[in-house]
């Protein structure tokens, strides 16, 4: 659980009303609701979080949860990761669809596919996807280009890998 003390945090009457409504909904939904807050979120958001952490830890919390509704207060790639790791009957929501991450936005799928094709065409490396078993160990003398991605990447890049 989030262990930050927000008792001294002052709020406007409007923010106080929103906070009270969120608390009511959390009480009403109980264990069916999980709110995840990334470290960089402001106090008025993370004060409602069940867990506060980095993108990897929070995605693990989503994967381990049986909550029906998971609200991910973080960047879009974080909610995508949580959605990939949760079951089909769980709903992962991102409160602000514009919540981005400059690192996640550095490479688009089009850019990566173009770079991939250029690396394959300019080297002797092969694409492992064309092997009978792409996960098997390469035979002696074979060299393959192996894609790797970082947690802070969009779901379409993770799918490419």
What are the residue ranges of the model-derived segments?
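Active-site loop-to-helix "anion-binding N-cap" substructures in soluble metabolic enzymes
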Residues: 1-161
């Amino acid at each position: 659980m989030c262990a930050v003390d927000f008792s001294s945090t002052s709020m406007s009457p409007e923010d106080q009303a929103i906070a009270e409504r969120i608390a009511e909904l959390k009480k009403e939904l109980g264990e069916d609701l999980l709110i995840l807050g990334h470290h960089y979120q402001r106090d008025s958001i993370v004060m409602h979080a069940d867990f506060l952490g980095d993108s990897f830890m929070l995605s693990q919390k989503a994967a381990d949860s049986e909550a029906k509704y998971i609200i991910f207060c973080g960047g879009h790639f974080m909610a995508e990761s949580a959605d990939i790791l949760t079951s089909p009957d769980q709903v992962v929501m991102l409160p602000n669809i514009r919540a981005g991450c400059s690192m996640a936005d550095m490479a688009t799928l089009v850019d990566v596919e173009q770079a991939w094709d250029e690396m394959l065409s300019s080297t002797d490396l092969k694409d492992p996807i064309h092997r009978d078993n792409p996960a098997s160990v390469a035979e002696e003398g074979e060299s393959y280009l192996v894609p790797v991605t970082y947690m802070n990447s969009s779901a379409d890049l993770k799918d490419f890998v």
